[in-house]
């Protein structure tokens, strides 16, 4: 019995201890729930607050069941906290909102929906289109055109060079027999014969000859077509043009008389009459036919006087003109040659241009652009015509009446020129006088000595008074003569 009572006492003691422990567990659970409910008012309780569960270290195996119960109670309390937070969020969503607080909010466009309305479409480009030659047709055309231009430049330049050399080879013997110096390039101080053409550019070649009686010199200019220019080649297909040889002979003043004369195609003479200063002033009439002298219909004559035409159109000259009429563009003899008309922006020039006694020949190379080196030999008789014309101009002289008429024509041209430029010359003289007065005043003002400055002013004043007195005397003399 004592053992039984003792066993009952132990049971009671053990029960009281376990009951006390259970009460402590419930109190701690209430504390945890109280703390969680306090922080459940915030919506971001899961992000900001970190709940820490009370942990107990139970060393005995008998307390494992109690620890399990404690953890289960803690999980239930956390679930309760989440449910409270959800209910609070639901309450805030169900609450009515104030329209004035969100004024203008609905007016904002929803850009996110508009961006998603038009989807981006990607087109698949076939790979064979990118690698095809058709994609580079523009580059191919440009390269082809560039190669064609370069090839044409080389071929055209070489052809002009061959034509020039062929002309020089066929005329060299004749030129060296009539001139001491052939081919001076002007680079040396002393005249030296180089015996070759001087290339000005790809289509113009020059040759200077001198050392002959009755002339200062002769300049030969071979004006070939611009065969090196592809555009010029294409333009010539629609309008053929011929190569030309231009020869300019400068005569001595004492070896040529005073006259102006020209013969050539009617079209060329009309152009020269319009462009050249001497032909427009001394040969104002229209070109006349040369049938009277046996010239073909393709050639016409411009002459200052009939005596000049009669003297120049001898048998040999007519022979040259008739047999080589297809190669002759123009022949121009003038003692008043000054080149093309001078056009100035501010009106007429104040003085007559300088003149030279000149013989000017322009010949067309046969072939109308399709010229070959062998065609240059056909121009040799025309060079003989030039040599003959030099001697003819030296021998020809006007009679006394013709000389007087020529002098009157030149005086008339000079008088007309002075009338046209009278106003301009007066303005130029007035500007020179004003400039002189201005310089005199500046010299007086820059004088530092007052006494010397006063004397200079008095001298200038006396000069002005003398000029006024001279003008008054001239006016009185004019009035007396008028009476």
Swiss-Prot record:
Protein's recorded name: PAT complex subunit CCDC47
Transmembrane segments: 136-156
Family per record: Belongs to the CCDC47 family.
One GO location term (cellular component): endoplasmic reticulum
Signal peptide bounds: 1-20
Listed GO biological process terms: calcium ion homeostasis; endoplasmic reticulum calcium ion homeostasis; endoplasmic reticulum organization; ER overload response; ERAD pathway; multi-pass transmembrane protein insertion into ER membrane; post-embryonic development; protein insertion into ER membrane
Pfam families per UniProt: CCDC47
Comp. bias (Basic and acidic residues): 105-118, 430-472
Keyword vocabulary terms for this entry: Chaperone, Coiled coil, Endoplasmic reticulum, Glycoprotein, Membrane, Signal, Transmembrane, Transmembrane helix
Glycosylation sites: 178
Known partners and oligomeric status: Component of the PAT complex, composed of WDR83OS/Asterix and CCDC47. The PAT complex is part of the multi-pass translocon (MPT) complex, composed of three subcomplexes, the GEL complex (composed of RAB5IF/OPTI and TMCO1), the BOS complex (composed of NCLN/Nicalin, NOMO1 and TMEM147) and the PAT complex (composed of WDR83OS/Asterix and CCDC47). The MPT complex associates with the SEC61 complex. Interacts with VCP, HSPA5, DERL1, DERL2 and SELENOS.
Outcome of gene disruption: CCDC47 knockout leads to embryonic lethality at mid-gestation, between 10.5 and 11.5 dpc. Mutant embryos at 8.5-10.5 dpc reveal several anomalies including vascular abnormalities in yolk sacs, developmental retardation, atrophic neural tubes, dilated left ventricles, poorly developed myocardium, and paucity of blood cells in the dorsal aorta. Yolk sac endoderm cells show alterations associated with endoplasmic reticulum stress, including lipid droplet accumulation, endoplasmic reticulum fragmentation and dissociation of ribosomes.
Topology within the bilayer: Single-pass type I membrane protein
Cytoplasmic side: 21-135
Domain of life of the source: Eukaryota
Organism of origin: Mus musculus
Lumenal side: 157-483
């Amino acid at each position: 019995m004592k053992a039984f009572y003792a066993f009952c006492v132990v049971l009671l003691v053990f029960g009281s201890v376990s009951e006390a422990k259970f009460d402590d567990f419930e109190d701690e659970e209430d504390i945890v729930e109280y703390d969680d409910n306090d922080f459940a008012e915030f919506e971001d309780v899961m992000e900001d607050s970190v709940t820490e569960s009370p942990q107990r270290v139970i060393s005995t195996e008998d307390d494992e069941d109690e620890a399990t119960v404690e953890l289960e109670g803690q999980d239930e309390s956390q679930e309760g906290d989440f449910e409270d937070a959800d209910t609070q969020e639901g309450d805030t969503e169900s609450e009515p909102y104030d329209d004035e607080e969100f004024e203008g909010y609905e007016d904002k466009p929803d850009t996110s929906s508009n961006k998603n309305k038009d989807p981006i479409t990607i087109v698949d480009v076939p790979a064979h289109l990118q690698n095809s030659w058709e994609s580079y047709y523009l580059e191919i055309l440009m390269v082809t055109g560039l190669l064609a231009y370069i090839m044409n430049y080389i071929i055209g330049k070489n052809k002009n060079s061959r034509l020039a050399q062929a002309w020089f080879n066929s005329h060299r013997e004749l030129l060296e027999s009539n001139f001491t110096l052939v081919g001076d390039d002007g680079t040396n101080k002393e005249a030296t014969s180089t015996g070759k053409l001087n290339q000005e550019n790809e289509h113009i070649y020059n040759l200077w000859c001198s050392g002959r009686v009755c002339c200062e010199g002769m300049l030969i200019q071979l004006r070939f077509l611009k065969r090196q220019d592809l555009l010029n080649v294409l333009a010539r297909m629609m309008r053929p043009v011929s190569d030309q040889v231009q020869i300019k002979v400068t005569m001595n003043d004492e070896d040529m008389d005073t006259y102006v004369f020209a013969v050539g195609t009617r079209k060329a003479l009309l152009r020269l009459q319009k462009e050249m200063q001497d032909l427009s002033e001394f040969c104002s009439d229209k070109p006349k036919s040369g049938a009277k002298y046996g010239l073909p219909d393709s050639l016409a004559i411009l002459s200052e006087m009939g005596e000049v035409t009669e003297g120049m159109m001898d048998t040999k000259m007519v022979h040259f003109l008739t047999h080589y009429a297809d190669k002759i563009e123009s022949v121009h003899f003038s003692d008043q040659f000054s080149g093309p008309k001078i056009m100035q922006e501010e009106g007429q020039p104040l003085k007559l241009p300088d003149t030279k006694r000149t013989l000017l020949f322009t010949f067309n190379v046969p072939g109308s652009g399709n010229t070959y080196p062998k065609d240059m030999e056909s121009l040799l008789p025309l060079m003989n015509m030039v040599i003959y014309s030099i001697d003819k101009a030296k021998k020809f002289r006007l009679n006394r009446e013709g000389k007087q008429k020529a002098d009157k024509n030149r005086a008339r041209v000079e008088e007309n020129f002075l009338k046209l430029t009278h106003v301009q010359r007066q303005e130029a003289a007035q500007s020179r006088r004003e400039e002189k007065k201005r310089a005199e005043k500046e010299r007086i003002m820059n004088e530092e000595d007052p006494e010397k400055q006063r004397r200079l002013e008095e001298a200038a004043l006396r000069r002005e008074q003398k000029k006024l007195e001279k003008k008054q005397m001239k006016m009185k003399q004019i009035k007396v003569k008028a009476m």
